[in-house]
Amino acid sequence: MQSIAKTFSLILALQTSGYDHTFSKVGMEPTGDRFDSILQLELKDWRPFNPMINAGAIVTADCIKAAEPFEEFLALVRKLCANPNIKLNEKVYQSEKRTGTRNRSIAYLLKSDHVLDGEPEEVLDVYFRMCSVMCTAKDLAHYAMILSNKGVDPKTGERLLDADIV
């Protein structure tokens, strides 16, 4: 799933922490920098520019208020993709965890600037797991169909997401 996980993480952060809290921690502005850049964090503002860059996605992972954030994330992915068999790829997760030094740097910088509420290693564990979920193009097409239909599954007619979150 890698970076597509960022969209699910944002949805879950909005559902569990609310709009105001989530966007007090991460902005909504585009950036012309690389997805893993920290340049703007130091130059412009203490908040990541948006939830679709690594710094922003780490923050949205921290904004998920649940006893088991990754389990909540996985349940949401399964629901929105209409596939109860979606799961974590343990090898990808271990690789992300082992090689995620830049993301570690970002998380500790965010913690030092009081953007992260949680402990960096705990937040990163959730983030690395999110990025390591395996799904198919068909799964993601179903998810896109729900987003394009303002949160309603057109196959079942069931509202799966509030329209204002979409």
Label every PLM stretch briefly:
Residues 1-2, 17:
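Short pre-catalytic segments that frame enzyme active sites
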Residues 2-11:
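Active/ligand-binding-proximal structured segments within catalytic/core domains
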Residues 6, 66, 158-159:
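Short N-terminal secondary-structure initiator segments
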Residues 13-130, 146:
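Active-site-adjacent helix/loop patches that line small-molecule binding or acyl-intermediate pockets
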Residues 54, 100, 134-137, 163:
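Electropositive phosphate-/nucleotide-binding environments in soluble metabolic enzymes
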Residues 133, 153-166:
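A penicillin-recognizing enzyme superfamily signal
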Residues 134-152:
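Active-site-proximal alpha-helical segments within enzyme catalytic domains
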